[in-house]
Amino acid sequence: MATLGGLTHSHTLFVEDDGTPVRFYIPPGPLKRQLYQLIIHGGGEMCRLQQPGALLLSTPGSAQGAQYVSTAYVMDCVRKGELLHVDDYRLDGSHGRKRQSKGMKQDEREGESSHGSDGKEQVKVGEGPEEEDELSDLGELVIEEGLEEDEQESDTVKIKKENKMDCSEAQKIGSLKSARIHQTGRNPFTEEEDVAILVYVRDNAPHRGTVTGIALWKEMEQRRVLKRTWQAIKDRYIKHLKGKQGYRLPLSAASRSHDPSEDESPQPITKKSRTNTSTPWTKRPGNIGRTSEKLGTALPMEKSSTKAPAEQSDAVESTSINFPLEKRGQHVTKGVVRRSEGEKKSSDMSKGAVSATSKEDQEDGGDLHIFEIANMEFEVDDTPEIELPKRSLSLREFVMGEDPPSSQSQTQVDEVSSSPEDSESEGLQEALLGMMSEFKLRLRDVTQALLKNNGELSATRHFLRTGSRPDGFPIWIRKDDLDLQKADAETQKRLIQKYGSDNVAKRVAFLAS
């Protein structure tokens, strides 16, 4: 026998027959400190956390359930010096009476079996009624044990049935949830909806800025182009439609008039393609008379022409762009350009232009506009072609999209056929096309990035690749450009602190170029 004070119980008290220690768990508290010494001294283990297979100790009245074992189990094991049956101390209340220890039960069974055999022999022989009472007691004990075993089996069967019911209910709930998710999910986009999104973006994105904002998509929702929210439409375009050419879109008004649309990829511009856009022409002595005669046949064709005013304006506009003008026909060119810029164009104006050009041709020997009208009627000489140089745009005009001043377009053309500005403009265009193909961006986005980086190609590439400038300074914004034009010392000081003196100087030179 062991006492609680001296801890004289066996060191293998809480050890199973196979040598594994019995594990216990009890919430922290003074009772845990008291039981900890008893369990550790008896060879058991005290777990810091709940683990599978560990006995959950609890005081009676604090927690109830078949998984909890009363703390009296440890105290009784220490007092009796043996490992008792744990089911007798469970706090579920299903067992009516306590079972005895394993050793005592085994001894009783052996004794009962011996007494039972003796009683049977005595009954057979016909000995006294005491043996009959012992046999009846033994029979009652066997019947009670059988009833207890039947109760345990019925409990296990009930637990299995409950587990099966729980699994079936869980499967039903999961199927219902999946059905609800499938029913309440977002409807997939159809091909017609994708085409409608692409057409609307193509026709309206240039007027509303980039597609990364919300103005374009909110307007699309307000116009009820699709029966969807603007968030869903934007998400569909950004993740699935942007940059893809899988759909055949209908032609827009701009594409019918031979204007490049936004969805078409930009064609590379080379020097050869630029020089071949206009038809070369030369004049031979003696062709003026034949030209005036052919103009007489060209004028009736002009009167009987059934072209729309917009097509005639396009023809006049292409004439003014593709063919350089001579000094003698500048006043005629002014009238043609003004008519192409105006909204109202009529056939009477084109007739007046043709008659004016024919008179000018008869007075000074013919000019370029007349030769363009009767382009198919001219005889081309074998002499080398003479091309007049075109005005090259400056860096700031090309990046910011500014039109050159009208006064410069009306001045005389320089006599120099090639200049460093031409090569600079060609190199800039090739660099822009390279960045467009490298970063999969439009010309508008690349030029905006170039504008924000003072026109520096290396800094622009670094900005498009990483989102920041290589020198660590921020990119220029519109407000700072306006402040830079003010003659304010405090503003200049603030800009220098923000962008650096070198960047401020470069920005001033860039805006002035």
From Swiss-Prot:
GO terms for cellular component: chromosome, telomeric region; cytoplasm; nucleus; shelterin complex. Residues 104-124, 338-348 have a biased composition (Basic and acidic residues). A motif (Nuclear localization signal) lies at residues 497-513. Residues 1-91 form the BRCT domain. Residues 267-281 have a biased composition (Polar residues). PANTHER family: TELOMERE REPEAT-BINDING FACTOR 2-INTERACTING PROTEIN 1 (PTHR16466), TELOMERIC REPEAT-BINDING FACTOR 2-INTERACTING PROTEIN 1 (PTHR16466:SF6). This is Telomeric repeat-binding factor 2-interacting protein 1. It comes from Xenopus laevis (African clawed frog). The lineage of its organism: Eukaryota, Metazoa, Chordata, Craniata, Vertebrata.
